[in-house]
Amino acid sequence: MKLNNISIYLVVSALLCASVNLSAQKVVRYDLYVRDTLVNFTGKTKRAIAVNGQIPMPTMTFTQGDTAEIHVYNELKESTSLHWHGLILPNKEDGVPYLTQMPIEPGTTHVYRFPIAQNGTHWYHSHSGLQEQIGMYGSMILNKRNDDLTFRKGIDDLPTIPVVISEWTDYNPNNIHRMLHNATDWFAIKKGTTQSYAEAIKEGHFTTKVKNEFKRMLAMDVSDVYYDKFLLNGNQE
């Protein structure tokens, strides 16, 4: 009899705790509209992808313990997706097409819903093709709960102002990807970081130049991409 009473007590206690946790959860909703747009950062008009009319995508703010509910409206002529970089969440919400979900097809809506299980500054981006390179990236701020034992008053309650630094190139991202795989020195030449044999001889480094040629890596491994502009929160630096 006593064992039965204890069992009933434990079950009731667990249910009460669960109901308290559920009532404490706050659902934070964002609506994201994905559309084609045109930008001009270099004097040339190029295609980009804007979300809610902006690049980068909107900064989304949550508090640890919240439930994120993100509605994605795909108004592109191609499929898309969103991946939450570094977040601990259910696998089905991870946003990788054909792996954890089907792509969000043109003209359709997809809802991501997951608990915010951590705090910190993170970012999210498209996981479809090379859409990230033309605008589909943004920041996420996950605030610490004020009842967290590690919460620092006067520090953790200060407003967070995200600064997103990114690069922009007028080249089509698919062309960049192809050129990198071709392993040419094109981007190094554009950056002015290559050295000819004549320059090596002039500087007295002919032997070093020859030795380096025998052990050099492929250009795609050592040459960064040449960018036309650097952007600060989507604006020219």
Indicate residue ranges for each PLM-predicted region.
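Histidine-centered copper-binding motifs that mark active-site loops
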Residues: Q25-E237
